[in-house]
């Protein structure tokens, strides 16, 4: 089992300094071009136009909201605590390049300040249903295009807050109606440098076939599936299956970021301090290595680096990213 203490001991000051220097250079570099036929979010082939910007959809992660629809087709999925109340309930943000091909996504819920800063990294159009008044300064600071509420209501026998979904074609229609561009308006290059990476020779490599993330509300876990070479997503004690086709939700890459937060009020609203630098883990192929992460501005890309300060090479495929509160980081475990 790997602990936060062991990781911090392994990360040298000069590794952090080197990574920060490289990261600042990358964030300030000129916009790169998307590559035709390649999904810049996964490094895999796509039929979507290379210039098509993604959508980021806020998805409820309360047990009552299950099953999730369209989650298995997301290119990148973020999970973070949505509130310090309700046993630190989490919420998901799923990012899709080829969103027109997904039958149904959701159910849709409100956004939080952190989601706005992260969605802005992708120049995505954020789909949500409202949010606390704390979100408005972040929309102003990022200039993020977003669509709030008014999506399809699908009767499922649940309370109204669990019935809103984005169905195929709806995102494109709403984007056009709002006058937003479907093409990138700002593209700072790929989040990840894709390439084959076994991690076998990396510093601090450890076995990671069974992973526990300290989100107490839903007990997020990942189990490495050697036959698919991906990590199967578990919560509430069961494998997460897509409500559309019952496919197990899984990811080639799993990132864990140690990230503290600021409590905004007594109602549990918060914002992660995701602009800065800290430690984390990268998991793929049943192994894990310690990394550092860096984000320098509201809209700047979060970049990941190995302990020697080199930009991390990430295996092509779908990616899950958890922002783990620093006060719980010591409870991250894998074996």
Identify what each model region corresponds to.
Residues 7-24:
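Sec-dependent N-terminal signal peptides
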Residues 35-78, 83-335:
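A surface/extracellular/periplasmic glyco- and lipid-processing/surface-interacting theme
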Residues 22-38:
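Sec-dependent signal peptide cleavage junction
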Residues 1-5:
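N-terminal secretory signal peptides that target proteins for export/translocation
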